[in-house]
């Protein structure tokens, strides 16, 4: 059993609030503290410890990329030699137009692609520039492009 199995009710209440939208104010942490019946330092200490220990990877604003002009997306599936997955995946993850990189081994005979990158662009063919760059900078060659036609659901996971 880990520390995370034993959150107090106050900690759970804090986490329920911060996993959605922070209060729109100059003192969001004090506002959260007031709402859950604790002090601001308790809120900050919890968030700081979870960030340091790893369950909170990052804490920041979520941008609605379509409204910011990044409305063309493509999932690019790459055929990758398992020996270079780390190298190729790390290089792809460094690219500013790639938001997600996953390695998913496949046993399907007609689907040899195992490394997946989500590429975002401002125009319909922007992903091709990123693909060509990755092909120049890594041993990746064979790929399949799965373009996003429509977003059917996009929500952040809620845990508490």
From Swiss-Prot:
One of its GO terms (biological process) is heme biosynthetic process. InterPro entries: AhbB-like, AsnC_trans_reg2, HTH-Siroheme_Decarb, NirdL-like_HTH, Tscrpt_reg_AsnC-like, WH_DNA-bd_sf. Keywords: Heme biosynthesis, Lyase. The keyword Lyase applies. Disulfide bonds: none annotated. One of its GO terms (molecular function) is lyase activity. SUPFAM superfamilies: Winged helix' DNA-binding domain (SSF46785). Pathway: Porphyrin-containing compound metabolism; protoheme biosynthesis. The keyword Chloroplast does not apply. Its EC number is 4.1.1.111. It holds the Pfam family AsnC_trans_reg2. It catalyses: siroheme + 2 H(+) = 12,18-didecarboxysiroheme + 2 CO2. Belongs to the Ahb/Nir family. Binds heme b, but reducing agents do not affect the activity of the enzyme. Involved in siroheme-dependent heme b biosynthesis. Catalyzes the decarboxylation of siroheme into didecarboxysiroheme. Forms a heterodimer composed of AhbA and AhbB. Also forms heterotetramers. This is Siroheme decarboxylase beta subunit. It comes from Nitratidesulfovibrio vulgaris (strain ATCC 29579 / DSM 644 / CCUG 34227 / NCIMB 8303 / VKM B-1760 / Hildenborough).
């Amino acid at each position: 059993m880990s520390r995370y199995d034993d959150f107090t009710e106050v900690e759970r209440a804090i986490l329920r609030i911060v996993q959605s939208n922070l209060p729109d104010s100059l003192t969001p942490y004090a506002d959260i503290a007031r709402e859950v019946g604790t002090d601001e330092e308790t809120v900050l200490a919890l968030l700081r410890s979870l960030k340091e220990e790893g369950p909170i990877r990052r804490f920041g604003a979520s941008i609605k990329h379509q409204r910011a002009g990044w409305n063309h997306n493509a999932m690019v599936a790459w055929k990758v030699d398992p020996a270079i997955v780390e190298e190729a995946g790390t290089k792809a993850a460094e690219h500013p137009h790639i938001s997600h990189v996953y390695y998913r081994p496949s046993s399907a005979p007609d689907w040899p692609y195992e490394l997946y990158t989500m590429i975002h662009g401002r125009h319909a063919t922007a992903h091709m520039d990123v693909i060509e760059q990755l092909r120049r900078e890594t041993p990746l060659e064979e790929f399949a492009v799965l373009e996003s036609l429509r977003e059917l659901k996009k929500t952040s996971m809620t845990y508490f």
